[in-house]
């Protein structure tokens, strides 16, 4: 990997390595180290990364579905349901797609036989890479859990078809009576074989079963992705299929949360927004809000507090105030208003298939290819 590649990987996983050799080791397959015995491969890093990812996902599910009530643990999901959800989140397919979406597989160090057999396309190889990167971060940060948690969350948010946000949309859609959400990618076809290369196409699941293909809109150069919840349609557009799906899924998720608030609350209390957000979390409407505080000084030397209210699926909302107590409320109010009052953009009607210079825009109304 050159300096630009290393920079891309580090920015993508939201972590800067102190020891760049560990990062390169994460991308080194055993076949390459056998040809270059002075180098270590990524197999042990993969082992540690697998264990870390397992713990992170289990904790994430605990915070989402379980709580202590009357000194006992109660859970919205039983053991079988939790096991199934976990298997989806950390499945070989899910982790491999994360790596394929972001394009990390092209940086792998492969032996000649692996190169010849194009193993960089293998799901197992990409799954191993995902876990090895996490293992490399663990070794580099001396197992700092906050940093590992941040990296795990970032990497899982590289939006696979069966990503965590997809599970939240699916769960809320059923719970609120909308039924199974329908995932519908836009696809273009061409008679030119050069356009059907892996860089231009991405195989994905539609909903939680079936497969289709999607490529860029030849007019805009952008990917498009649609999600339907009941009669409500949401369209995402992005430079890559992962970003397009993320944009559509976030719209659907925000819509479902607003619907859940309407069903559970007559009125929201905006006088104490931090408390209201906590109540929404306790009632499992939203994930738990994380707060980050930072103190600095203005031009007159007066202390000022900056607060970031961070909510998974929404992003970060900031405020500044001389009072640490008040700055938390200010940041919470921005987030609460965004959750409850922001108008969610919906698509009234998806376009029917049209033709662009010999390329057919294919829309599958039944969600099947």
UniProtKB/Swiss-Prot annotation:
| Superkingdom of origin organism | Bacteria
| SMART domains documented for this protein | RIBOc
Q: Name one GO molecular function term.
A: rRNA binding
- Alphabetical keyword list: Cytoplasm, Endonuclease, Hydrolase, Magnesium, Metal-binding, mRNA processing, Nuclease, RNA-binding, rRNA processing, rRNA-binding, tRNA processing
Write down any Gene Ontology CC term: cytoplasm
Is the keyword Cytoplasm assigned to this protein?
yes
Output the GO biological process annotations, alphabetical, semicolon-separated: mRNA processing; rRNA processing; tRNA processing
Q: Which reaction does it catalyse?
A: Endonucleolytic cleavage to 5'-phosphomonoester
- Matching InterPro entries: dsRBD_dom (IPR014720), RNase_III (IPR011907), RNase_III_dom (IPR000999), RNase_III_sf (IPR036389)
Q: What does the protein in this record do?
A: Digests double-stranded RNA. Involved in the processing of primary rRNA transcript to yield the immediate precursors to the large and small rRNAs (23S and 16S). Processes some mRNAs, and tRNAs when they are encoded in the rRNA operon. Processes pre-crRNA and tracrRNA of type II CRISPR loci if present in the organism.
The residues that hold Mg(2+) are: 46, 128, 131
The text of the family note is:
Belongs to the ribonuclease III family.
Please state the Enzyme Commission number of this protein: 3.1.26.3
Q: What is the name of this protein?
A: Ribonuclease 3
Cell location: Cytoplasm
List, for all copies, the residue spans of the domain called RNase III. 6-142
Q: Which gene does this sequence derive from?
A: rnc
Q: Where is the active site?
A: 50, 131
Which segments constitute the DRBM domain?
A: 272-341
